[in-house]
Amino acid sequence: MAEKTTVRSVTYDLLRSLGLTTVFGNPGSTEQTFLQEFPGDFSYILALQEASAIAMADAFAQVTGRPALVNLHSSAGMGNALGNLVAAYHGNTPLIVTSGQQHRELVIGEPYLGNREATTFPKPWVKWSYEPARAQDVPEAFMRAYALAVQPPAGPVYLSVHMDDWNQPMAGPARVRTVSNRFAPDPERLRLFADRISASRRPALVFGPEVDRAGGWDAAVALAEKLRAAVYGSPLLDRASFPEDHPLFRGPLGMSVKTISDRLAGHDLVVVIGAEVFRYYPYVPGDYLPVGTELVQITANPEVAAAARVGDSLLGDPKLAIDQLLDLVAEGSARTAPEPMARPRLLPQVPNNPLTPPEVYAVLSRVRPPDSVIVNESTSTMAQQIEWLPTVRSGSFFATASGGIGWGVPAAVGVALADRDRGVSRAVIGLIGDGSSQYSVQALWTAAQHKLPIVYVVMRNNEYSILKSFAVLEETPGVPGLDLPGLGIAALARGWGCRAVDVETTEELEQEFKTALDADTTTVIVVRTQPQQAML
């Protein structure tokens, strides 16, 4: 006979079996029946605002390679979290997001803190959204949520649970299942792709974030070297999938239709692996591909394959596909290897005042530890980061997968927590714009409370520089609200419990960064910089 217990007890046993023992959230009254008598072998990561909770969990899941559990407060908490939920969805991050629903006896009367149409609210930014019809269905709903979250394309799922369900009687234990989280490509179609690649005179490889997520970094390098092919990063990368200091690396493709087409001119075949075709913004008209250029795409995401504007697609795990391509494609020894990407790295003999972003990155290139990880949300300076701080290892660069800001500060917290969880010691560097730093700023408190080894470098140019750059490109002068005077970023960081300093010179930046690496808490370094036009 199954032992009689409660829905809550059975669910926690299930979560324990699935390895879901870290909960990110901000508790509310409708969630306290779930959180009561919180198990000692679980960890609760308190975020002071729900957008921070989602981004922390997102990065934590990416680094650990395991799904993460997020507990939000009813509809209000979901509303606060939605912006960063969009990023998790686009980034294929397996999150199980939950929130409390009002008591079943009250919900018919639209009570205070009732979550009206709870399963509709997070759509379309979740793979599945469900509210169990019976209390006894809660554990099985979690099992199904887990299975859906990890299966490709991975992504967030949502459960709404009535607050009175947790203490209802139930016979345990829950049924625990395992599911596959990858699938191999169609071998016949992959062979056709391999034949086209082998016949190509001047192929280009475009690697997207799916490659790094699948553990395909080394395989991607091997394929590029066997083909002697130019390698580009897909537009708006949230994960790097190829060493950016490699001689075959040609930089990111760009963002607009015309820019991408121009970059690909001269290639007869473009092989896109683990990326969209393509993530465009802004609209600059042009040909989707140069005349005479063909394209093939390999992705684990059917929606990404269906949305491609050009080319032929193949579904399958990117790493499995690359591993098989290595055996199928012909050696490219007859091809002329592309010229290495130019890296001018020009600096003035006398430092500017205020400093320029390249001057800031030049300092960081000298002093950052080689095994450090970068979280970037300085959107107008990403091109300079690739030039001065290239990503050279798998899992060492993260950025938001959506167009919104407010992900980077809490994501750095999630990375550092994940490193601690898996016993890895490395510095986490958050490269943050001053505008971005004001979103999800509450995450600094969580970082300080956990004494995380994060160094935030905030470039204070007193404006939304990326938006001013778009205004020039899109010919939209006179847009209000693009200047940010009067921000006391360091004072604010100190208020959250971080060590924080303002610097203005390269010498000050170098010294404070070195000091931050030895500090026993999170440090925020605010650097006054010149505005610059972003490379769009």
Mark where each language-model region is:
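Phosphate/pyrophosphate-binding active-site segments
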Residues: 1-6, 136, 160, 172-174, ...
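Active-site diphosphate/adenylate-binding microenvironment
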Residues: 7-12, 16-21, 26-29, 34-36, ...
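Conserved short-loop catalytic and cofactor-binding motifs
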Residues: 129, 178-181, 208, 248, ...
